[in-house]
Amino acid sequence: MLGLVKKIFGDSNEREVKKMFKRVESINALEPTIKALSDDQLREKTAEFKARLANGEELDKILNEAFAVVREASIRVLGMRHFDVQMIGGMVLQEGRISEMKTGEGKTLVATLATYLNALMGKGVHVVTVNEYLAERDSSIMGKLYNFLGLTVGLNKNGLNPEEKREAYACDITYGTNNEFGFDYLRDNMVLYKEQMVQRPLFFAIIDEVDSILIDEARTPLIISGSANKSTELYYICSHFVKRLEEEKDFTIDEKLKIVNLTDDGVSKVEQAFNIDNLYDTAHITLNHHITAALKAQVLFKRDVDYVVQEGEVVIVDEFTGRLMVGRRYSDGLHQAIEAKEGLRVQSESMTLATITLQNYFRMYEKLAGMTGTAKTEEEEFKKIYGLDVVVIPTNKPVQRVDSPDLVFKTEAAKYRAVVNDIVERHKKGQPILVGTISIENSERLSQMLKQKGVPHNVLNAKQHEREAEIVARAGVYGAVTIATNMAGRGTDIQLGEGVAELGGLHIIGTERHESRRIDNQLRGRAGRQGDPGSSQFFLSMQDELMRRFGADNIMNMMDRLGMEEDMPIESRLVTRAVESAQKRVEGSNFDARKGVLQYDDVMNQQRLVVYKQRKDILEHENLSDVALNMIYAVMERAVSLHCPKEEVPEDWDLQALADAANNGFLYEETITAKMLKGMEAEEILELLKAEVDKQYKQREEEIGESIREFEKVVILRAVDSKWMDHIDAMDQLRQGIHLRAYAQNDPLREYQFEGYEMYQGMLAAVQEEVAMYIMKAEVSQNLERQDVIRGQGIDMDNLQTSGPSDRPDPETSGDADPKNRAQRRAQEQERKRQNKKQ
């Protein structure tokens, strides 16, 4: 029935594309007029468009003419003319949607259309790529086009100083990686002077390989952290201990969720070994944390699959691309546990200073768009999480690639023998072959087998990152054999060499199905670009992880019943259905996991947005006296509310405790006594305290002079930053154990939201209390500067680290003044009283 409806009415994607084709015809009609313009006249169109926008004209009204101008400029500068389908891709981006365009269809050129149009607004367009190589390449090549049209182009790279970054962001168009844009946002919210900020308000971002950035990387938050000096000996002790534990008896592994849990026997062994009564007692949180991390490191994380050891350090391998993520570390003590497992020097744990998920970072843009060759399978996620529709753009020429059915073998060894035999036969003809593997270990295993057969080849995995683009670009030449880990080299076109088309084009071999159909489609999509011939074939075994995790037993039993030899493959719809069913289940599970990460981060995000806005307001305002006084009043009101509760009669109030709280917290010592407060109503007490606060605050202003304004700013920044860091850490710890609430029939997310809100309110109160005490009691140094503001947290501010999908920050630091000791304050107050008596 659905097929009949589609035949009669066409699907929604087809209807949208047809509608856009009509608009392309209007753009094409402008071509002769635009072509007749001189270079200067073409360039002047940019100023004309800007003027029209300034006068209130909408972007959509100038789209046709602007796209025609970009197309003509591209012909003159780059020698490339946008195809009609590329114009449609540009329209989709302009509408804030995702253009799905097959490999080789020219996504980089498509982006120039929407980038130019939106850059005319003068608010800055960010073009986001998956790595710095692509950002540099695209900004260099496409920058010539934009410069010709009178627009400026910046490159935002890791390692630039703040001034260079400000220049890059001030440009009309800025290229960079998702990580660098996200880390700059976090660093901007750690600066001590508004002039140190580098980003403008987030206007429009076009994300290349949008599925990789918004989906594959979505579960990994961006984190800026500093090392906290704690003992590392316990990591070695726990690593040695967990080697004695036995699977099933002492611990269980959930391969689908990748978690490990101690059994009752395992818990007993820990308690006996460490001579404690209850591992889950709050006094043993640290030990529990270390044991869990050591067990995860021992049984869930494999060397040369999840990480490699290089020059005495554990380097994470990106599970999606196979690239080494130098500088990135696992959090929550896991990285230290792996270092202990490998017998390396354990580096100290880090404390999170700032963090955000890519999901919440990119959702802050006023408008968002993306491009990729594979998005349709994840359309639901793009829509629900980011509000992004996916539009599949037709190819310029029909796809000629032939995708053969999967070949399934009983064992992994038989599968690899078949792969090698296929490579040898095709290599004899000179047909280029690209082999996709899912791990460094598998790529090196295959490489050894090919060496034994005398087949020359290139291995492209995380260990050859520098040569990545060069190797991929040459994968289509006569006789080339390239082994690539996952989708390494993504973003680089594979063009066929001379005579290769006659041999059948590039042949793709997949050695294992990925848990996501999208990744499999990406591998296939490397062949058959722009109407070229090509082919693909996946070789599977019943021992592959996906098959093993999701019930290969039935198929294995069938193969045994048929008496099949180890080297004899089967092509079966049953197998294909089983694989696709497994992939859909994993995709659904991964979507739920990413959605879960976002739901929890949304709690932090609401708090983060408020804190960062308040912090920005602090930086931008010169006079914070009202802010400071309101914080002191809030502390005062809480003290009165606590010690003079409405439900008690005044005779039962603890007036001495209230006097102590006032004198120690926000007034000079001995200002208030319980005797003074006796017989007063709560409102009268508040009035008295407020009058004293106002009087003493005015005295502070007179004593300190003009520098009190800077002093207030330093104190408030220090309080906000230090308490926010503590809050991030506390929220992370809450999150780690919140799932246990499910055992008590409570919804963990609701519990996290409720407790997170209470903790946030507690953080705000702590900020107010610290500000009140410092402003009313601290000694102000003569050379007051905003430095060392976040010192005192046990953090080495000179060695900050970033993690997420990689790189590192270099935030500025700032300072505070210490309060006088009790004796000094008392002496000062007595002197003040003597002076008052004289007057």
Curated annotation (Swiss-Prot):
GO biological process, one term: protein import
Single GO term (MF): ATP binding
Annotated segments matching region Disordered: 794-839
Catalytic reaction list: ATP + H2O + cellular proteinSide 1 = ADP + phosphate + cellular proteinSide 2
Record's protein name: Protein translocase subunit SecA
Bilayer topology annotation: Peripheral membrane protein
Quaternary state and interactors: Monomer and homodimer. Part of the essential Sec protein translocation apparatus which comprises SecA, SecYEG and auxiliary proteins SecDF. Other proteins may also be involved.
EC top class, as a word: translocase
Family of the protein in this entry: Belongs to the SecA family.
Gene3D superfamilies referenced in this protein's UniProt entry, alphabetically: Helical scaffold and wing domains of SecA, P-loop containing nucleotide triphosphate hydrolases, SecA, preprotein cross-linking domain
Compositionally biased spans, kind Basic and acidic residues: 807-833
Keyword line: ATP-binding, Cell membrane, Cytoplasm, Membrane, Nucleotide-binding, Protein transport, Translocase, Translocation, Transport
Organism: Brevibacillus brevis (strain 47 / JCM 6285 / NBRC 100599)
One cellular component (GO) term of this entry: plasma membrane
Pfam families for the chain: P-loop_SecA, SecA_DEAD, SecA_PP_bind, SecA_SW
Subcellular location(s) of the protein: Cell membrane; Cytoplasm
Top-level taxon in the UniProt lineage: Bacteria
InterPro entries the record matches: Helicase_ATP-bd, Helicase_C-like, P-loop_NTPase, SecA, SecA_CS, SecA_DEAD, SecA_motor_DEAD, SecA_preprotein_X-link_dom
EC number: 7.4.2.8
Lineage of the species this protein comes from: Bacteria, Bacillati, Bacillota, Bacilli, Bacillales
Function: Part of the Sec protein translocase complex. Interacts with the SecYEG preprotein conducting channel. Has a central role in coupling the hydrolysis of ATP to the transfer of proteins into and across the cell membrane, serving as an ATP-driven molecular motor driving the stepwise translocation of polypeptide chains across the membrane.
